[in-house]
């Protein structure tokens, strides 16, 4: 554990470095410390911090920069959320205040707002759908071999997909199957409707000759409705932290975000943190499981929508980001997003 003075020096180095991105010397630290300390004493204390692996020297400067261990100590012991300018709060309020027609629209907008405010890559996952119920199901024929399945749930979401059917199924048979499906499924939560229930319905003669094909279609649309969709915005901002000459890394980063479930898993996992109950979790690049992310940090925040479940928002940015500002932003934003979703759900109660 560091002394109070050593902690102040480490905090000063990190806060200056995240603002200037330049190595920090003892004179800079002396001018910014809230206590009066000689330059010689600061140099001695910086040597102690360096010996402990919390700061390190670059080859091009006599100043020091934080190490991964230094950032981790700072995040676990010293960081304080910063109050943001009123204009930021006003922007969040005005952009979340517009009318939305589905939960997914709100969650997607959350990712866009966070990315715009930070110039980082933002992620957002909606609340769990554990208590969402089916309120209606329709199959609309588009041709003799093609239909659109439409599922409406109690949170106002409408899921629709187009399917090709293996047989000619006529309107009367579709209506018969839809009537049976609505009788059996409406009012049940997405979690209650499992494969065994659908199999039982398939054995029933109430749905007509092709009920099995239609129920497999229902199973697909139910899976999509129950799945947690992650929205990503600001992928272009990855270029700000990657060498423009390293085209291969840029392409790999894009593929990692667009096609891999890594971030969804990371957003669900708990970062190593001194306070396990702290609402904002931070994983440094050295703690992330892919070498492409070694110069990035992932900040995740959980938001709570009461009985409607919990969701997650996240930011992926450079390791030398201003953590106080970003943590302050995520703390405020998660509460505002939860309020917006509670207001939205209130319309359906």
Curated annotation (Swiss-Prot):
Pfam families: HrcA (PF01628), HrcA_DNA-bdg (PF03444)
Keyword annotations: Repressor, Stress response, Transcription, Transcription regulation
Keyword Transcription found: yes
GO MF annotations, alphabetized: DNA binding
Signal sequence residues: none
GO annotation terms (biological process): negative regulation of DNA-templated transcription
Function: Negative regulator of class I heat shock genes (grpE-dnaK-dnaJ and groELS operons). Prevents heat-shock induction of these operons.
Protein name: Heat-inducible transcription repressor HrcA
Species for this entry: Lactobacillus acidophilus (strain ATCC 700396 / NCK56 / N2 / NCFM)
């Amino acid at each position: 554990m560091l002394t109070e003075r050593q902690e102040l020096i480490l905090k000063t180095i990190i806060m200056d470095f995240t603002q200037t991105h330049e190595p920090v010397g003892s004179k800079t630290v002396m001018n910014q410390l809230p206590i009066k300390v000689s330059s010689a004493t600061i140099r001695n204390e910086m040597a102690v911090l360096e010996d402990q692996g919390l700061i390190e020297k670059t080859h091009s400067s006599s100043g020091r920069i934080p190490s991964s261990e230094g950032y981790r100590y700072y995040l676990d012991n010293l960081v304080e959320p910063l109050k943001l300018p009123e204009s930021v709060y006003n922007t969040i309020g005005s952009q979340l205040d517009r009318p939305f027609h589905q939960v997914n629209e709100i969650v997607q907008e959350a990712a866009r707002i966070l990315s715009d405010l930070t110039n980082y890559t933002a992620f957002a996952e909606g609340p769990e759908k554990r208590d969402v119920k089916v309120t209606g199901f329709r199959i609309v024929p588009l041709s003799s071999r093609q239909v659109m399945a439409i599922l409406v749930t109690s949170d106002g979401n409408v899921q629709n997909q187009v399917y090709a059917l293996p047989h000619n199924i006529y309107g009367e048979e579709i209506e018969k199957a839809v009537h049976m499906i609505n009788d059996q499924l409406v009012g049940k939560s997405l979690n209650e409707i499992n494969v065994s229930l659908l199999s039982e319905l398939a054995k029933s003669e109430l749905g007509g000759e092709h009920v099995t094909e239609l129920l497999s279609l229902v199973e697909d649309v139910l899976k999509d409705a129950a799945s947690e969709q992650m929205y990503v915005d600001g992928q272009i901002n990855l270029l700000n932290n990657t060498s423009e000459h390293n085209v291969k890394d840029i392409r790999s980063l894009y593929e990692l975000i667009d096609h891999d479930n890594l971030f969804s898993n990371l957003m669900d996992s708990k970062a190593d943190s001194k306070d396990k109950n702290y609402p904002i979790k931070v994983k440094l690049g050295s703690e992330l499981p892919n070498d492409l992310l070694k110069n990035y940090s992932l900040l995740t925040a959980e938001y709570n929508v009461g009985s409607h479940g919990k969701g997650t928002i996240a930011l992926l940015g450079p390791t030398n980001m201003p953590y106080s500002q970003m943590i302050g932003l995520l703390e405020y934003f998660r509460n505002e997003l939860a309020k917006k979703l509670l207001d939205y759900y209130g319309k359906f109660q």
